[in-house]
């Protein structure tokens, strides 16, 4: 029991020590998408990048996809040159785990429009960024720095009716950043289902 407590304390302290901070360089990664293509953060230097942690079985994620909110954001910003990477970190056997073909079918059915859907079943990318919930959003600027992390909006509910009345932190941050303005709200508390790591 004592060893378990010490191990837990070490994990908490390690996570706190290496927690991402706004303005820090975003951690480098390479991941494979649902079509088998590799994506490296380094390849997108000079572009804004959005990382969206998702889980199609999570009611909070469902809220943003059934309302069309997430797809609308994806289309709006990828049309402006933003790279939008949806990340699936659910482990095999856990809620939200998808094979490549299952994810491609889901993306088509949901009319989703990310640049790519990255498969992260071992949770390596999720742990690298400290992704806690679905959705959990991160924005990286063209210089490779983290400029926003947290919730998608200010209504932490599963109610689709709340979407039109919400302040969308991601949309606001991207609008400000792509206009050359400082991002006013750089970090918020993410809400949603916990990421289903093993």
Task: Mark where each language-model region is.
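Sec-dependent N-terminal signal peptides
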Residues: 4-13
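Sec/Tat signal peptide C-region and signal peptidase I cleavage site
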Residues: 13-19
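Cleaved targeting-peptide boundary
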Residues: 19-27
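A short beta-strand-turn-helix
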Residues: 29-49
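Short active-site neighborhood of thiol/selenol oxidoreductases, capturing the structured segment around
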Residues: 42-63, 174
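Structural microenvironment flanking redox-active thiols in thiol-disulfide oxidoreductases
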Residues: 62-110, 121-128
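Short, internal strand/loop/helix patches
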Residues: 104-141, 146-147
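Thiol-/selenol-based redox modules, centered on thioredoxin-like
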Residues: 139-198
């Amino acid at each position: 029991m004592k060893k378990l407590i010490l191990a837990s304390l070490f994990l908490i302290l390690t996570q706190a020590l290496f927690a991402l901070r706004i303005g820090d360089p975003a951690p480098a990664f390479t991941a494979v998408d649902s079509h088998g293509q590799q994506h490296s953060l380094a390849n997108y230097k000079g572009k804004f990048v959005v990382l969206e942690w998702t889980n199609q079985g999570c009611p909070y994620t469902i809220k943003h996809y059934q309302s069309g909110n997430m797809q609308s954001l994806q289309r709006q910003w990828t049309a402006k040159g933003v790279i939008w990477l949806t990340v699936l970190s659910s482990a095999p056997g856990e809620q939200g785990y998808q094979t490549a073909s299952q994810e491609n079918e889901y993306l088509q059915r949901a009319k989703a429009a990310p640049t790519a859907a990255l498969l992260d079943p071992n949770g390596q990318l999720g742990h690298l960024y400290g992704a806690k919930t679905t959705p959990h959003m991160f924005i990286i600027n063209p210089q490779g720095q983290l400029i926003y992390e947290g919730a998608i909006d200010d209504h932490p509910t599963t109610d689709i009716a709340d979407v039109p009345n919400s302040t969308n932190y991601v949309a606001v941050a991207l609008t400000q950043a792509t206009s050359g303005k400082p991002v006013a709200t750089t970090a918020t508390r993410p809400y949603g289902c916990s990421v289903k790591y093993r």
